[in-house]
Structure formats: C-alpha cells, structure tokens
Amino acid sequence: MEVLAKHRFARTSAQKARLVADQIRGLPVSKALEILTFSPKKAAVLVKKVLDSAIANAEHNEGADIDELRVGAVFVDEGPTMKRIMPRAKGRADRIMKRTSHITVVVADR
C-alpha cells in the first residue's frame, strides 16, 4: 500500500528542496521526521509538513500502522516561476525570479 501527499506551489526553489528530500528517501518515517525536525533548512519545514500529511493519510484512509511505514519516494518538481523587476542604475532593470516547486512524498508499508 502506497499513500502520497503533495504540496504544490511551495515557495522554495526545487534545487534547495531536493537537498532535503535526498536525506530522507527510503528511511522509516520516525527517522525521517527526526532528521527534518532538526534540519536548519527552510525546505525541511515544508517537506516535514508534506510527510506529516502523508502519514495522516495512510493512518486515516488506509488504517496503516505508523511504525511500519517507510518513506517510499520523495520528489521535487519545478513549479511556475514568478518574475519580478528590480530597477537598476541608468534606467536598466533586472529580473528577479521567485521560484516555486511541487513537493511529493510517498509513504509505503514495509
């Protein structure tokens, strides 16, 4: 049994979120939550929320035992980019790219 949860349009770049996602792939959920709780990265908070949601989905919808769950797959895809203008000297302008990402966590029983 596999259960997934998604956070779409997360306000962090996919590159930064993948650093966190790579740390928890394949781990038991208790160990993954421990790693995410003590990680100093902003993306760790976002990934932890998605993991908590996936665990709750597995428990509520499938009746799964939390102690038996593992992080099956974690992937982070790029979302749309918001483009902003930063005025510069001599009438020029630079683009500011506000990147978003789609975080998906799949938990499965052993």
UniProtKB/Swiss-Prot annotation:
<keyword id="KW-0687">Ribonucleoprotein</keyword>
<dbReference type="InterPro" id="IPR047867">
    <property type="entry name" value="Ribosomal_uL22_bac/org-type"/>
</dbReference>
<comment type="similarity">
    <text>Belongs to the universal ribosomal protein uL22 family.</text>
</comment>
<dbReference type="GO" id="GO:0006412">
    <property type="term" value="P:translation"/>
</dbReference>
<dbReference type="InterPro" id="IPR001063">
    <property type="entry name" value="Ribosomal_uL22"/>
</dbReference>
<dbReference type="Pfam" id="PF00237">
    <property type="entry name" value="Ribosomal_L22"/>
</dbReference>
<dbReference type="GO" id="GO:0022625">
    <property type="term" value="C:cytosolic large ribosomal subunit"/>
</dbReference>
<dbReference type="GO" id="GO:0003735">
    <property type="term" value="F:structural constituent of ribosome"/>
</dbReference>
<protein>
    <recommendedName>
        <fullName>Large ribosomal subunit protein uL22</fullName>
    </recommendedName>
</protein>
<comment type="function">
    <text>This protein binds specifically to 23S rRNA; its binding is stimulated by other ribosomal proteins, e.g. L4, L17, and L20. It is important during the early stages of 50S assembly. It makes multiple contacts with different domains of the 23S rRNA in the assembled 50S subunit and ribosome.</text>
</comment>
<comment type="subunit">
    <text>Part of the 50S ribosomal subunit.</text>
</comment>
<dbReference type="InterPro" id="IPR036394">
    <property type="entry name" value="Ribosomal_uL22_sf"/>
</dbReference>
<keyword id="KW-0694">RNA-binding</keyword>
<dbReference type="InterPro" id="IPR018260">
    <property type="entry name" value="Ribosomal_uL22_CS"/>
</dbReference>
<dbReference type="InterPro" id="IPR005727">
    <property type="entry name" value="Ribosomal_uL22_bac/chlpt-type"/>
</dbReference>
<keyword id="KW-0689">Ribosomal protein</keyword>
<keyword id="KW-0699">rRNA-binding</keyword>
<comment type="function">
    <text>The globular domain of the protein is located near the polypeptide exit tunnel on the outside of the subunit, while an extended beta-hairpin is found that lines the wall of the exit tunnel in the center of the 70S ribosome.</text>
</comment>
<dbReference type="GO" id="GO:0019843">
    <property type="term" value="F:rRNA binding"/>
</dbReference>
